[in-house]
Amino acid sequence: MFDIDLEQFANNTCLITTDEVFSYSDVIKASKQIEEVLPKQKQLIVFLCQMDIETIIGYIASLRANHACMMLDASLDKALLDTLIDTYKPNFIYKKSDEDDQKTIFRYKNYSLIQHNTSTIELNPKLSLLLSTSGTTGSPKMVTLSKDNLYANCQSITEYLQISSNDRVITTLPFHYSYGLSVLHTHLAKGASIVVTPESVISRAFWDSFKKYEVTTFNGVPYHYEMLRRIKFFDMDLPSLKVMTQAGGKLNHTIAKEFALWAKEHNVKFFIMYGQTEATARIAYLPYQHNIDKAKSIGIAIPKGKLSIKDIDTQKIIDEAFKEGELYYQGDNVMIGYASSLKDLQNTSSLNGTLQTGDLAYKDEDGFFYISGRLKRFIKVHGKRINLDEIEHFLKSKGYRVLCTGDDDTLMVATQDDNLQEIQKLLIDTYALHHSTIKIKHIDTFPVTPSGKIKYSELKKAFV
């Protein structure tokens, strides 16, 4: 698997469910069954991913056989899925299926490997993984990643998290999501164990498995941590827990500090991290020793990576502290490039290991980096440039449950609270905005993707 020899961990426990336990030897044996029915020439294989052992086995088999894997959400709308299939014309589709399709060439448990296209597809020899840039929208735009990208990011993450064969993680993030895949990669690479469950963190069954199998590591996006507070996580007795990580968006710094303080008190290492699919997964991390005094920071570059800030207009590197610019990243984990068509899968990298993140950032006097917003998360209200992330974070710091979006001349605030006039007055007083430029709407449930990221485009529709 991307040049990591899983055979060295043959006797280690690899995958655990409520019904089964697979050693690494079992996983290798199962994956070889799939490898043997696939052609030797590199194939494009679409995975309709679910949180189960079958998805993991199929994925490992395809990587070991040097094929290209397109990871998609199994619950993706059929019309959107059809668009992707028509665009990329994959050789095979691997999915959960109750009955054999006439084109099924192999079944592993209740999954079918279906031959979809027998034509030869010209693929970049280094292409290993395709991930969507758009969550569940079904856009054909994909991030393309090489084995070298996967290996580099895996090595960096295992180094700073100090993952070992003694670790045991539980699935919380989908496998079509770069963060979820990185958790899988890093633990397999070290011969660690993975408890595989489809249960949500708000489910009693999830925590029953967590305790029964003595899970050491928890990973989550901001949504997960907000849910943990609601289910009274701080009152739980979890003696096996040693490491917690957070990525997938900015965690409210008040919540981050609460978890940092709890973690310190319970001898748990809590890592706040930052990444993008375009960099395979991880770009920066906040060392756990600083998660209290620098709770708002994304930290420092991952091992073997480099962060810099460039002036938006001149593109010159900004060396001084607290001066805002666009964040750039350099490292071997930077993608091959984007693909929007089958022809794009032949492309070789033109990025030279450099990623323009699209995030506004600054660094402090100690060299720790802070995200201040998105270049595209700005609106102009009566000629005034408004940072939507800044306003959202400001309102959250005042205790309001809000999300912000907008367009030209209108700031839109969705809230789960009832005090709409109070929020409007605060915005008028703080940002000198006219009341006619602000729309505030009560929404019971914020729209999120399966990986817990906010669907701002859908949020905006609520104001139409």
How should these model regions be labeled?
Residues Y151-R168, S178-T217, I302-K304:
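Conserved AMP-binding/adenylation subdomain of ANL enzymes
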Residues Q115-S132, S139, Q162-R168:
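Conserved pre-ATP/AMP-binding loop-to-beta segment of ANL
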Residues V215-G220, R229-D293, K306:
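Gly/Ser/Thr-rich phosphate-binding loop
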Residues N11-P39, D82, L145-D148:
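Conserved AMP-binding/adenylate-forming core of the ANL superfamily
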Residues I300-K304, Q315-T348, I386:
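Conserved ATP/PPi-binding loop(s) of AMP-dependent carboxylate-activating enzymes
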Residues S23-Y24, L127-Q155:
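Conserved AMP-binding A3 loop
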Residues E20, Q33-S75, T172, R385:
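Conserved AMP-binding/adenylate-forming
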Residues F47, G331, G337, G358-H435, ...:
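AMP-binding/adenylate-forming catalytic core of the ANL superfamily
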